[in-house]
Amino acid sequence: MLENPAYAWDSQRDQYCCRRVLQRLERSCSPSSWRVLGVTEVDLFMPILKYVYGASQLAGRCAVISLHRLRPQYYGDKENEPLLWERAVKTALHELGHSVGLTHCRRRQCVMYSSWRIQDTDAKLADFCPTCRELFKWNLEKRL
């Protein structure tokens, strides 16, 4: 779990800039690290988006996910740890997919489908569709 990334705070948006978090992760990870996934509780954004559940460097080593908007309580629902972790796993797999070069998929149940709303995350499976799975394997073999 990442400590509070105060260095990424944007007072105009009352959120944390995802790019700054990724840059810090990249500088701090060991050259021998294959992939690094940061997990945080803070609300993240990208400059062109209101918020993000996670972000990664396309074909890069670092990714980050935020539990902030993955928590059911954020939407006025009661606490539900199994649902939170299901959402976190899907978001982490999605960002891992980006880190090996995958782009968004059009299949709603594929973990690489873009989540614009939490309902999109909930509708996905915690798995790649057959096409994305093959692309994942191919990209992974190419990078190892």
Feature map (PLM): residue ranges:
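The catalytic-center signature of Zn2+-dependent metalloproteases
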Residues: Y75-L144
